[in-house]
């Protein structure tokens, strides 16, 4: 067999392997064919397609660039390169690819359709809509155009319009990948959990093994309180991918909700063995260790979480509260001051910071942040309660009574608030009695 025949034979075998889903073998055969004959642009293009199917955008881009060195203006290759560059976040370079296509052939619709998602990634939603309407002038009803503009609308919070666009995609292409899952996400974001559930079920009927859909559906079921069904979805993920950290983490969350503490701890420790920097796992483990009064170990995990989570405000809030529970007041104070700098309009952040100041006996600083919390959220009975306690400690009974009265109006059934209100009422009565007695004593002396 001569070199030309062997290279063609390997390329044909690669095509068959690609059709069979044996992607790594297909890539190897194409690379062997290219090594024999490095001047065939189609083989580089096909190699790019194989790498795309393997979710390897970096190597796909390399293959497409090689193809373009041989055939510089090929529209399909430029289009695929633009798509991968968008996935990698190189949006300006992606736009250059699409614009090069449009200059050579203004009727090539994918160059407009794919620019919808590129502009969406850049946050330029006006241009995304321009591309949508330009694409529709060429192809009146393209399911991918509706899908892409739906993503833009979803990002902007225009959920109803996003759903309508995705339903158009569904009408035009009932088997469009993950279309039911996207509609489910929008309904979930709208708070319509039952409709979201129905669309996740529809997506799994189309693709029963979709790990992404199984994970999302499992979390939705957890939110619905359908814990047994939720756990079944996460276990289906683990059947395919035994080391899926997210599935183990969610099973730990389920166990925690059901007070199966040993199982929860086992799952969170397993998550950290698989992925040592998995977001949230150290915090959950710290929470469990606090329940078991193992404060030193809990603190170690909570501080590890801070190193992983960076400026994630939700995690700073959670870890700050847990450090307060662990009585690691100075650590908590540092975390919560950082949170307040990042989220100055967050009433809960100011309140938690106030609590840490109170625990450090910095009463005036605590009062300052409690008042800021109430300014941001007027109906905040817990902050009013703590403010009343702080003024009671300072001996400012009138202010303490005023704040506890407001708290009692907001939460009349709260036992702590009612008890403090009773105490302050009694204290106020005795204070007045002492004042009257002293006044009467002075009066009697004057009459003598």
Where are the predicted features?
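Register position in tetratricopeptide repeats
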Residues: 19, 53, 87-88, 121, ...
